[in-house]
Amino acid sequence: MRVYQTNEIKNIALLGSAGSGKTTLAESMIYGSGIIKRRGTVEAKNTVSDYFPVEHEYGYSVFPTVFHVEWNNKKLNIIDCPGSDDFIGGAITALNVTDQAVILINGQYGPEVGTQNNFRYTEKLHKPVIFLINQLDSDKCDFDNVIANMNAIYGSKCVQIQYPVSTGPGFNAIVDVLLMKMYTWGPDGGMPTIVDIPVEEMDKAMELHKTLVEAAAENDETLMEKFFEEEALSEDELREGIRKGLVTRSIFPVFCVCAGKDMGVRRLMEFLGNVVPFVSEMPKLHNTRGEEIVADSNGPESVYFFKTGLEPHIGEVSYFKVMSGKIKSGDDLTNADRGSKERIGQIFACAGANRIPVDELVAGDIGCTVKLKDVKTGNTLNGKDCEWRFDFIKYPNPKFSRAIKAVNTAETEKLMSALLRMHQEDPTWLVEQSKELRQTIVRGQGEFHLRTLKWRLENNEKLAIKFEPTRIPYRETITKMARAEYRHKKQSGGAGQFGEVHLIVEPYAEGMPDPTSYKINGQEFKINIKGREEINLEWGGKLVFINSVVGGAIDARFMPAILKGIMDRMEHGPLTGSYARDVRVIVYDGKMHPVDSNELSFMLAARNAFSAAFKEAGPKILEPIYDLEVYVPSDYMGDVMSDLQGRRALIMGMDSEAGYQKLQAKIPLKELSNYSISLSSLTGGRASFTTKFASYELVPNDLQQKLIEEHAAEAEEEE
């Protein structure tokens, strides 16, 4: 394989909802380019993409697959991304290292929630988009309705390059209004026959051609002037206008294929090779210092590793994009993130499960290598005198969590090691050892995401594991003022222990003025503040600690011990053992002994006084509330609304968008526990959602009592 230069390379992400046919399209592209001699199928589990055992087990893409095709002296690096929203991280990774996206649309359903999710990410990253309508041979395909829905969502920027003469099982012809030709196929697909557009299709073709010419002309003043003068553009001028429209996202070309029968795939690759922008024509990336980085093969050597993982029969494979300069086998590079040195082994052009050894890859190209000693996903490796770092991939918050444990506790360490390594392969799921909840928690994008994780642990790592519900991080607070005092006294020969603390607790809200007096037992006491600490608690909220002891009742040297005792009880609220927050404590009196008083005595006295006062101050449990956005087909809106109301959700607003609804709500975290499973069941997997922490709010009284009883039962069981 020859070395391709930067101006001969195009990087493309293949996106689409689950079932839209991306892996089948990828197989046809690889077959059409001659890399493989026979097309595999998803059903036969022998495709170049989707080659991991877990993907064979479930019949869905789990990881993004990198491959390339050589077409008309161009190199197209293509990343086939998982379609399930549970694996959205693959699409996000791919979009950040490619320059444009082909978004497949299932001709049976039109734009789905997954389509719109993918499109939003292309919008955020300002990537060109080509829409590809697939499954045109399905008897459920309604092409005109699909186009109408696309126009309703994406507007006039959707410009048809092609349309099918008919759809359904007899599909065998596409009219191309850029070339003004018709492509036809025999029943087995493959190489097309290119013919003139028949008379009965000419009016429609001319109308769409005129729309295409107008859209292309709008992207270039010279083309616009020619269009006004002649009302026509040459084929090359059309390509130039479309290319500029792709870069500015003013045109979203629409193509047609039947990937399963290899119809229309070669024409798509021709367009990708001839029209879509090169790496060198796209906006420049920036390093972590904000410096603009040009994809220049003569620039400093810098390589970004966007994906690492263990692959069958090979070991660790690391995928990279050359950001600048050239990379060759044997290069000595420095890891800018870890400070370690790396010698690059054999480098490869990617072809899914296959790899093709190459001598060199230049700026803008994508490749892989194996068995690096200290490279993780997201690391940057540089040559001499280069200190760049890249950190541009941002992943969404997890939406589904479970506690995880090894069935055999002796394998706990092995489990943690495997989890941390697998997080490097897929950064969209997180592992946390929660001191607060006393659980090891894995958080992912959905139930299917974690189910595939479990399968890999059991089958690849030979670990027996089990999932349990994740505990909820409740908080405790108070609703009224209360006072208490406690004397700690212990005498056992020699120096004893003595400390007495009198204190007041009350709810604290941001901006509250400091107290000047309090009524205690009907008598008003003035507060003389000797010291004040405002502590931002690491679990959220505040503790305000005021020392107003006068007359030397307690030495100032014991105040840190008193605060420590209070903080100890703040970490273990009396209702459920949860963290306490938003409390003001005023220590106003106490007693000490000239010999027996010490820090331990006052810490214990303060802890018990605070606990007693807290219980009398109208203690309440707070629960985490999340902002929820649900994207759902309009047909399912009633069921989704009803389900949310049963989950104590507060509906905040709704928007409609071409057959879909975007619903905003606030919902307790407890009610989100199995929401991804329920939503998928209600909508046949055609809805998606995002969440974000919003606030802590009081739980209803009936739930509070239930939580207190559950905590008491757990505490008794542990004893």
Each language-model region and where it sits:
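Structural and coupling elements of P-loop NTPases
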Residues: 1-719
